[in-house]
Structure formats: C-alpha cells, structure tokens
C-alpha cells in the first residue's frame, strides 16, 4: 500500500513564483549510466546530453481542486536529466528523470518522499537578492549560485554547445513528462505536467558551486544555458503506470 502512495496517486497543483534553471551539457556517454534501461537520453547533435538544476520558489502546492489556503510554500532544488521514452502505444515522449530533490521545508521532505520517487532531502537553502544579483546557497552542502538578473542582452555560456538561445530553449525545462522506473517489476511511472504562459528568459550565471552535480563525477561537463521563468501556474496529472519491455 505504501509503495502505491509513491506513484503520484492524485493530481497536484502549485504556483511557481520563479524558477531558475541551469542546464549542463556532457558527452552522452557520461550520462548514460545515470538513467534506467527504459529511458534514452534526449541529445543535441547526437553528441550532448543534459543534466539540469532547477531552483524553484513554489507556493500553494496542494491536491488539485483544493483551496489555495491549504497549499504549502517551499523552495525546491531539483536535479534531473533530459530523457525520452517510447510508450506502449509507440508515442515518443520527452521528459525528465529525477536524480534527487532538495527542499527548505521538513514537511515537504516528508510528503515528497511519501507521494513521489523524487528522493527529497531537507537542506538549509537560502535565497537573497541584492543589486539584481540572486544568491542561492546552502551552508550545509556548500551549494552557491549567483545569477545576474539585470542584463537583458545575455550571451550563451562560454563553450555552450548551442548556436543561439532559440536552440538552447529546447533544453530549458520544465518538460511535459517526468518518469520513474521500478526495475524489479519493470514498471514505468509517467507523470504529465501542464503549464501556462511559459516564457523562459535567458540569464547570466556569475558563479556556481553545485556539490550534488560535482559528486556525480561527470567528465566533460559544461554549463550550456540558464533561464528564469516567473509566475507560472502549474499542475501535474495523476501518475499512470505501464509495464516496460525493450522496444
């Protein structure tokens, strides 16, 4: 029974006040080992695969249809890989595979680990803003990210594999689907997200230290793009499970 609760058993809605997403590129061979057998990497030029770090201020997280005052607010950092999945019906779905999640609220850590497979951990995330520079830090883990939100004419990060920001937006997230996998039962859990008014804006990353990503020891990792989205109503449909066989 408890395992069924983790399969996103009901629809959920929330409001993203702002979401800063940093996407890192690596040779696809370096990320292949991090995803389950049912998924394939979503690549650029059949060479680069991507891991994203999303830092999201969220409010009003609650079962869909419940009044807003019953919702929870929290800060979330999600670590995910861009992937593809071919469904039983033959549909090719783009989405994300979650490696881990961090939050500043103990309640969110508990509920997140009851109702999802996203590996929530409570940390000491703090966000401050001074002179148009956003500083996101965790004194426990050593995470530190500084983002310049003032400039409107932002260049792609040095060594980015993308030719321009239009090309880079394909790997901005969030994507329509999130996948989890039970290798023992060979079941894939598919959660579909629905968003509105999604306009990602390029941002400049002044500096970044992200221990979770560094501890994966990914060779050839480079910052590929960075975006912010603001004021986004979002909801996730109830999760659905299907059996997987190699196809």
PLM features per residue range, with description:
Residues 2, 117-247:
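Interaction-surface and assembly-scaffold signal
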Residues 12, 29-79:
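Glycine/small-residue-rich interface belts in oligomeric ring/scaffold proteins
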Residues 60-141:
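Aromatic- and glycine-enriched beta-alpha-beta binding-site module
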Residues 11-18:
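Terminal, regulation- and interaction-focused segments at domain boundaries
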Residues 2-6, 13:
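N-terminal intrinsically disordered, low-complexity segments enriched in P/E/S/T
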Residues 6, 74, 225:
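A domain-level signal for the structural core that forms small-molecule/cofactor-binding pockets
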Residues 27-41, 82-92, 243-245:
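Secondary-structure boundary elements
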């Amino acid at each position: 029974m408890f395992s069924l609760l983790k399969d996103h058993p009901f629809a959920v809605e929330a409001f993203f006040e702002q979401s800063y997403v940093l996407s890192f590129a690596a040779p696809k061979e370096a990320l292949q080992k991090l995803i389950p057998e049912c998924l394939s990497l979503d690549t650029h030029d059949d060479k680069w695969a991507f891991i994203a770090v999303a830092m999201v201020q969220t409010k009003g997280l609650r079962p869909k249809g419940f009044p807003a005052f019953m919702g929870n607010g929290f800060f979330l950092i999600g670590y995910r890989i861009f992937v593809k999945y071919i469904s039983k019906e033959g549909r090719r779905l783009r989405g994300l595979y979650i490696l881990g999640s961090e939050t500043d609220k103990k309640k969110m850590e508990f509920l997140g680990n009851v109702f999802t497979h996203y590996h929530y951990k409570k940390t000491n995330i703090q966000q401050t803003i001074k002179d148009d520079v956003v500083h996101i830090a965790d004194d426990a883990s050593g995470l530190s990210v500084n983002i310049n939100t003032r400039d409107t004419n932002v260049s792609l990060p040095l060594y980015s594999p993308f030719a321009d920001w239009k090309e880079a937006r394909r790997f901005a997230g969030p994507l329509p689907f999130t996948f989890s996998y039970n290798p023992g039962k060979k079941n894939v859990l598919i959660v579909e997200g629905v968003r509105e008014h999604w306009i990602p804006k390029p941002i400049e990353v002044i500096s970044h230290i992200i221990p979770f990503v560094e501890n994966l020891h990914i060779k050839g990792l480079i910052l590929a793009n960075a975006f912010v989205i603001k004021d986004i109503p979002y909801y996730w449909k109830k999760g659905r499970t299907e059996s997987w066989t190699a196809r």
